[in-house]
């Protein structure tokens, strides 16, 4: 996604877009976020698997649900089973959280901010929302990542 994509979408009649997760802060600044929504919290997909984890384990219930899997170093990843089409979405082990980047986000001036929830428990949702409403308060009391916002893809 780049300024040419943004211009194409504008000509096609789209008035708003969600800022691409792959771009870092300086790339987002060049792109311009005046008509964009910027995701500031949420577990991001890292992989879509065409093989169902539950089916492979012989535990398929044909009901979409969430489960977890660990990688070789013991990091736990949230996995959403999509039984309607027999595939899985594997999410990053830590959620994106840009609350500690308040000043930089204000300078980017996105039209709106998105807080995206998936499998969080009620208490977690409340905690994250309180921090977001508190204008990106202090460092959160949970593990998080800032993904590409600071370092970019390359």
Regions found by a protein language model. Give the residues of each.
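Active-site pocket-lining/capping segments in soluble small-molecule metabolic enzymes
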Residues: 1-154
């Amino acid at each position: 996604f780049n300024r040419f994509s943004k211009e194409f979408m504008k000509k096609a009649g789209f008035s708003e877009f969600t800022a691409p997760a792959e771009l870092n802060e300086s790339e987002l600044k060049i792109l311009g976020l005046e008509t964009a929504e910027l995701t500031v919290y949420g577990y991001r997909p890292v992989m879509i698997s065409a093989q169902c984890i539950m089916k492979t384990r012989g535990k398929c219930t044909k009901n979409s649900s969430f489960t977890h899997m660990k990688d070789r170093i013991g990091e736990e990843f949230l996995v959403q089973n999509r039984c309607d089409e027999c595939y899985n979405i594997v999410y990053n082990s830590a959620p994106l959280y840009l609350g500690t980047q308040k000043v930089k986000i204000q300078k980017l001036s996105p039209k709106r901010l998105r807080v995206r929830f998936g499998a969080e428990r009620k208490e977690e949702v409340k905690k994250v929302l309180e921090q977001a409403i508190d204008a990106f308060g202090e460092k959160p009391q949970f593990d998080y990542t800032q993904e590409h916002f600071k370092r970019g893809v390359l």
